[in-house]
Amino acid sequence: MMSFEEEQLRDHAVVNLYRIGAIRFGDFILSDGKKTPIYVDMRLVISCPDVLQTIASLIWRLRPSFNSSLLCGVPYTALTLATCISLKYNISMVLRRKELKHPNQEDKIKVEGLFSPGQTCLVINDVIASGRSILDTAKALEDEGLNIRESLVFLDRQVGGADALKEAGIKLRSVFTLEELVKALLSKCQLSETDAAIARTLLETF
């Protein structure tokens, strides 16, 4: 059962993400080409330390019971989240490079930081859609000998990402599903009439 403190953190996150414009309603196209009436832009939280820390706390509450000595944020939006979690909870972090540091050398560096093969690493992300970015990050980490068992995210858009991760042997844990987020927006935020109408229509699709 959710604690009162966690409920407060969730409410704070939703209200403030909408307030700063990180959650918007309208007509948007995702990176995979699919259309959506709601867009969540977590890049804006870097300018709002209190919101960033709230989201980091919510994500960290999802952590599994087994010991994980490392975490890695999916580049690039989740790097700030991962860094915040690392500093707040004193857990080591590694960095996956999307662009290789030495592309013309044999010793191409894919993962930066101090780690040893066999360690377990949690993959942190802000939003999951198809799951491709998490899977790409997991593969880079596994290529270096790290074990990837779970991924923690703020929002699951519920468009197949969790199933894609499951097929790869990775369990997904999310603070919100898209359905839960929309319900929270309707109950906790003072949405404009237009946004509220879009939110109610979106809920009917779940």
Curated annotation (Swiss-Prot):
Q: Where is orotate bound in this sequence?
A: 157
Cofactor section: Mg(2+)
User: What domain of life does the native source organism fall in?
Assistant: Bacteria
Q: What class of enzyme is it?
A: transferase
Q: Return one GO MF term.
A: orotidine-5'-phosphate decarboxylase activity
Q: Which EC numbers characterise this protein's activity in its record?
A: 2.4.2.10
A GO biological process of this protein is: 'de novo' UMP biosynthetic process
User: Which UniProt keywords are given for this protein, alphabetically ordered?
Assistant: Glycosyltransferase, Magnesium, Pyrimidine biosynthesis, Transferase
What pathway does the annotation place this protein in?
A: Pyrimidine metabolism; UMP biosynthesis via de novo pathway; UMP from orotate: step 1/2
Annotated TM spans = none
Q: Which InterPro entries match?
A: OPRT (IPR023031), PRibTrfase_dom (IPR000836), PRTase-like (IPR029057)
Q: Which Pfam families match?
A: Pribosyltran (PF00156)
Per the record's keyword annotation, is Magnesium included, yes or no? yes
Q: Which residues of the sequence carry a binding annotation for 5-phospho-alpha-D-ribose 1-diphosphate?
A: 97-98, 101, 125-133
Q: Which reaction does it catalyse?
A: orotidine 5'-phosphate + diphosphate = orotate + 5-phospho-alpha-D-ribose 1-diphosphate
Reported function: Catalyzes the transfer of a ribosyl phosphate group from 5-phosphoribose 1-diphosphate to orotate, leading to the formation of orotidine monophosphate (OMP).
Q: What family name appears in the similarity comment?
A: Belongs to the purine/pyrimidine phosphoribosyltransferase family. PyrE subfamily.
**Assembly description:** Homodimer.
Protein name, UniProt field = Orotate phosphoribosyltransferase
Query: Which species is this UniProt entry from?
Result: Chlamydia caviae (strain ATCC VR-813 / DSM 19441 / 03DC25 / GPIC)
